């Protein structure tokens, strides 16, 4: 029997029925699902030091278990001393089993390591059922060795869902274990 991530199994067995009951879907295909997770990291100082991009790509690769790619600038910005085509960040897109594994690790081991953690804000929804979460320090992930970090930096995590409204997306992410703050 093939390995199935814990959260994927939980989604199929419990979350689909809970969301169907809550929103009254007529068909299982109407139930929103998590489509992808995009983790991105901007490295503004990379304009002067090219090695910072390599560190960012390496850190994202360690955190996600999938090779990250460097992002490049699309146009010149003279005030930032930036030229078109220069690397300015890194990103990785997770789908399928790796996506569920990352979400599981984020909820169970990484978010509880944040100082004074009382839940994540529910203000990161974009109106179309996607959620954006900012992480201030990469050292909350157990895969990162604190002694080998040359600079503490944050990252953006985007949860792309098939939900059409923010309410549906919040219910989906809450059922999958994201700890939102109580109002």
Swiss-Prot record:
Keywords: Ribonucleoprotein, Ribosomal protein, RNA-binding, rRNA-binding, tRNA-binding. One of its GO terms (cellular component) is ribonucleoprotein complex. GO terms for molecular function: rRNA binding; structural constituent of ribosome; tRNA binding. GO terms for biological process: translation. The keyword Ribonucleoprotein applies. NCBIfam families: PRK00010.1 (NF000585). Belongs to the universal ribosomal protein uL5 family. This is one of the proteins that bind and probably mediate the attachment of the 5S RNA into the large ribosomal subunit, where it forms part of the central protuberance. In the 70S ribosome it contacts protein S13 of the 30S subunit (bridge B1b), connecting the 2 subunits; this bridge is implicated in subunit movement. Contacts the P site tRNA; the 5S rRNA and some of its associated proteins might help stabilize positioning of ribosome-bound tRNAs. Part of the 50S ribosomal subunit; part of the 5S rRNA/L5/L18/L25 subcomplex. Contacts the 5S rRNA and the P site tRNA. Forms a bridge to the 30S subunit in the 70S ribosome. This is Large ribosomal subunit protein uL5. It comes from Flavobacterium psychrophilum (strain ATCC 49511 / DSM 21280 / CIP 103535 / JIP02/86).
């Amino acid at each position: 029997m093939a390995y199935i991530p814990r959260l994927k199994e939980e989604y199929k067995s419990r979350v689909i029925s809970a969301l169907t009951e809550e929103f009254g879907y007529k068909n299982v295909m109407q139930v929103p699902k998590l489509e992808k997770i995009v983790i991105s990291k901007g490295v503004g100082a990379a304009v002067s030091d090219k090695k910072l991009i390599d560190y960012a790509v390496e850190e994202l690769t360690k955190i996600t278990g999938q090779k990250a790619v460097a992002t490049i600038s699309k146009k010149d910005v003279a005030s930032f001393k930036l030229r078109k085509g220069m690397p300015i960040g890194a990103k990785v897109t997770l789908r399928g089993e790796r996506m569920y594994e990352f979400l599981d690790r984020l909820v169970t081991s990484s978010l509880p390591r944040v100082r004074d953690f009382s839940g994540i804000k529910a203000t990161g929804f974009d109106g179309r059922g996607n959620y954006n979460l900012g992480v201030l320090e990469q050292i909350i992930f157990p895969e990162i060795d604190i002694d080998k970090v040359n600079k503490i930096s944050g990252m953006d995590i985007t949860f792309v869902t098939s939900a059409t409204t923010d309410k549906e997306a919040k219910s989906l992410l809450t059922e999958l274990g994201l700890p939102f703050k109580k109002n």
